[in-house]
Design a protein with these regions (language model features):
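Compositionally biased terminal segments of proteins
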Residues: 1-97
């Protein structure tokens, strides 16, 4: 899985769950034609407790690292959590707003 495939999967999931979001960082810069090397994707998103089940279902533990406990803490404290695709080394940082 490459960064664009992972980004597509993330945004399709966020759209399906009704989570508003903003792609930022190097991936956003590349979309505007600024070449960058990156192994992570940064997204600011309005994730709420009601979205946790959908996120866990969309990114199964046999393919991704995603911690329910860390998501809950990130929502409670307005922090960030990661969705990691170990076989590709790609990481998505979700910054909770």
């Amino acid at each position: 899985m490459g960064p664009y495939e992972l980004l597509q999967r993330i945004v399709e999931t966020l759209d399906r769950l009704g989570i508003s979001y903003l792609v930022t960082g190097s991936v956003a810069a590349m979309a505007y034609g600024e070449p960058r090397l990156t192994n992570d994707i940064d997204i600011v998103a309005a994730v709420e407790e009601r979205h946790i089940g959908g996120l866990l279902a969309a990114f199964p533990l046999d393919e991704f690292y995603l911690s329910e406990e860390i998501i809950r803490e990130a929502i409670r404290r307005r922090l960030q959590f990661n969705i990691i695709h170990p076989s590709s080394g790609l990481k998505v940082e979700i910054i909770v707003r």
